[in-house]
Every structure is written in C-alpha cells, then in structure tokens.
Amino acid sequence: MSFDNSARCGAMNAADEIIGPPLAQGLADQPAIVGGARSVTYGELEAMVNRTGNAMKAHGVGRGERVLFLMDDSPEMVAGYLGAMRIGAVAVALNVRLAPRDVRYVIEDSACRLLFVDAEFAHLYQEIAGELADPPQVVVRGAPQRIGMALDDFVAGQPDTLASEPAAPEDIAFWVYSSGTTGRPKAVMHSHGCVLIADRMEAEYFGVRPGDRIFATSKMFFGWALGHSMMGGLRCGATVIVAAGWPDPVRMIEVVDTHRPTLFFSTPVMYRNLLREGVGASEGFRNVRHFLSAGEKLPETLYQSWLEATGKPLIDGIGASETIFLFLVNDAGAQRPGSCGKPVPWAEVRLVDEAGADVVEPDIPGQIAIRTPSQFRGYWNLPEQTAKSLRDGWYFPGDMFSFDRDGYWYHNGRADDMLKISGQWVSPSEIEGCAMTAPGIAEAVVVGVPQEDGLTRLVLVAVPKDPSASQSRLSTQVQDTLMANLSIYKCPRTVRFVDELPRTATGKIQKFRLRELLKAGRL
C-alpha cells in the first residue's frame, strides 16, 4: 500500500492513509495518543484498530454499514473509528451532548448496525432504546451496564492483524452529523480519498512533524478536531492529546501544563474563557508554537487580548463539516487580524453575487463557493439539500464573504438565518417551536446578539398569553421546556418578554429590531 499524497487512483483505505505513514516511517514505538496517565504508541494503536475491526466483522458489520460512536475522546474511540473505516464500514462520531430524542433520530436516520457508547452516556441510549423498531448492537466502554456487551469482551481474543477492505477514493468512509436548517442533525458524507490532504495544513503551514504534540479542545465529533487533530496529527506522525470530559478552561490549562502541546486548536469562546482564567501565567502555554482558532468568527479584540496575554497570536481560519479541513487560513508569518486569511493552495475559493456571477472586485460581499479535494459527497437521504449545496462541483455553504485588495477574506455572516454558537450551528426556528410548547407562551423569537467581546449569545424574546402573568415563572417554565427537549447548546440562557413583536407591513417579524433593542439594553 502506498501512503504517498499522489495515491489518488485505485484501491485505498482511509485508515491506512491516516495511520500508515507513521508506521512506514518506523514510528511504531512513538506515542500516537496520550491522555491522562495513558500513552498509546503507533504500534499499539495499530493493534487496537485491527482487534476492533476484526470484532466488528465477527459481529456482522459489513461494507458501507454505519458504526456510531457516542464516546468521549479516547484511544478506544480512535481505534474504533479507524477500525470501522478499515473494514469498509462508515464511522460516525456523535455529539455526547445530544438530547435523547436526537440520539434516537440519528440511530434511525443512519440505520446503524453497531453503537459504541461510554458508560457515562449510556442513559442517552437507554431512554430511547424501547422506541427503536430496529435497535443496533451496543458495545459499552466502562462500568457494566444493562445494555449491550462490554468493550473488553467485544475485542477479547480478536487477532491484532487485519487486511484493509479496498475502497475507491470516492467511496464513503465517515459521516459528520451537522445541524440542518430544521434543527435536525444531517449527515455529511465524506470519502476515503478526502483524508489524503489531512496533513497538508499542519505540515506546510506550521511545520508539524514527528515529535510534535497536537491538542484540540473540541471533541472529535466536531470536524475541527476530527480533521486537523486526529486525522492530520496522526498522518503527520505527531502525538495527539485527548482529554476526558467536556472542555472547560481550568481543565484545559491543566491538560496543557501536563502534556505540553506544540500546536493548540480551539474556538474563540474557549480562548476568551482561557483569558479569564489567567492563561498567561501557564507555563505549558508558553511551550505552544502556534495557536489556531476556528469554529466561529474571531473578534479582533480577542485577538489583541490573547496576543497581549501570551505574546503569541491567534491564527484564524475557517472550514466546515462539509470540507473537514480549513479552506481559508492566516499564515503564521503574515496575519491580518479580523480576516479568515487566504485560500489554502489545495482549495479553490470564489465569490458569486445574487445573479450567480463571480465577484472579482475587492470589498464587495458575495456568497462563497469552495472546491477542495476533501469536499463532502452529499447529505445522507437529503437530495434537495445536497443539490442546493453542491452545484457544478462547487460547495455553497450559504456564507457571505468579501476579500480585500491584498487577498484576505472576511466573513460577513450567513445568507440564511442560522446561527453559530460555540462552533455549532443552531436553528432559531427549532428553538422557537419548542419554546412555544411551554405553558403560557404565545409567540417566541430567537435572535443572536453580539456580546462586548464580539461573540454571539442566544436570546429568546417571547410574548406571554397572559400579559399579567409572572415573567419570572414564565421564564422558568420556558427554560425548563427547552432543557427537557433540546441539546444544551441550543438553549438560550436569556429570556425577555414583550407585549408584541415588531413586524413589517406584511406581517413578517423584524428580528433586526429586536437585536438592536437588545444591543442597546432597551429590552
């Protein structure tokens, strides 16, 4: 098997392209994954991948069948993910903060054959297991549960060698679930061939090589960590750092001080929170060579605050679940604060106006279109959305951009009403519909309001059925309803009440007026 970047034709396998290069370089004894007190070498990871892949085959998982992972980042999760791709199955990592109803939806939507779940998240499956017409086989990592079989038993006695299932570059290797315009998760399908560029940004922009350590604060269900930390880091022969538990700034500082990454991937909201925790005093952060930011717009004020606190800049870029890897990024030596950088050499990027013509002059907004080797193959079971987003070989994400005379690109917002909160797409209409099921709520509108630090928070503006009702009680009721039915990142922490919503002459709600009132502190 060739692990050369030119291996674009003929049989291949994504798992081989990710873990094969470091093994071919003789790095079997070097650490591939570290976390907590554990360290797993490339040779040990290869054996884990093969045992898990063999176990999947023994339990009837076949080519093209979906294998879901409701797991925290860990060597076992990575081994299972690569093992699924190695046998020709489709690996799918899930957000561990999904609501049970969303877990049910994903299981049914994917028609998955096998579900790996950590014991601490088993309740998310148990709550909906009885509602499934065709439940998957379940494998549990951690404390014994009343469902499925233990991971140790699942892989026990399996060989640590495994011949990879040959795949064409365009065959599907993995999915990434991303929220759709209705709020329902949608499966973004990626091919085996897309991983062939997994290492290019790390190697060509930031000089990553064996001996480097990469840490992404985001979890691997998120394309930022999956593509650039796990896939890119391993393909470069670097060490990938994983951290148990949901990321919080205090814990992230502890991880950095313990494991000393040389490359650090995170989001603007985490960088802001790290500053609040006094990251400048951390010895581990002084060891980091490059700090990269993606997932949402990086405010210039946050860029400057980070530079003052650490002495090193935040390198901003932008990608998407549909591209897995960044398509715009600032160069470490030539940054433009406030911009997303310039197109990477392996991606084509252009702007189009409302008539579909190319925008060729600077400082004129248009809708961005991207063409890259890592482009997704479509949305599972959503042909209309696929046709809307993939046109003549170009991916249209629905984002508005402009570029300046020096070729730096700037994000101008969404063409539709979707909002990005903590790096994840949120559908206001889904939240609004849920809020209006709460007792006493007649109407509800969700808007994104910029904070002083430039990030966005969700605010729910509601009209009570009874204007004399206690707003405190109504606020509690609506927030309880949201928390019971939606994933936590979709739940606004702020609720405001009005007698009526501002509307146009044709009856359309004017969200911009609500946003202006909230920004001015008049609501």
UniProtKB/Swiss-Prot annotation:
Induction remarks: Transcriptionally regulated by HbdR.
Catalytic reaction equation(s): 3-hydroxybenzoate + ATP + CoA = 3-hydroxybenzoyl-CoA + AMP + diphosphate; 4-hydroxybenzoate + ATP + CoA = 4-hydroxybenzoyl-CoA + AMP + diphosphate
One Pfam family named in its UniProt record: AMP-binding
GO MF annotation: an example: ATP binding
Any GO BP: secondary metabolite biosynthetic process
Keyword annotations of the record: ATP-binding, Ligase, Nucleotide-binding
Entries under SUPFAM superfamilies matching the protein: Acetyl-CoA synthetase-like (SSF56801)
Assigned EC number: 6.2.1.37
Family according to the record: Belongs to the ATP-dependent AMP-binding enzyme family. Benzoate-CoA ligase subfamily.
Full protein name: 3-hydroxybenzoate--CoA ligase
Organism: Aromatoleum sp. (strain CIB) (Azoarcus sp. (strain CIB))
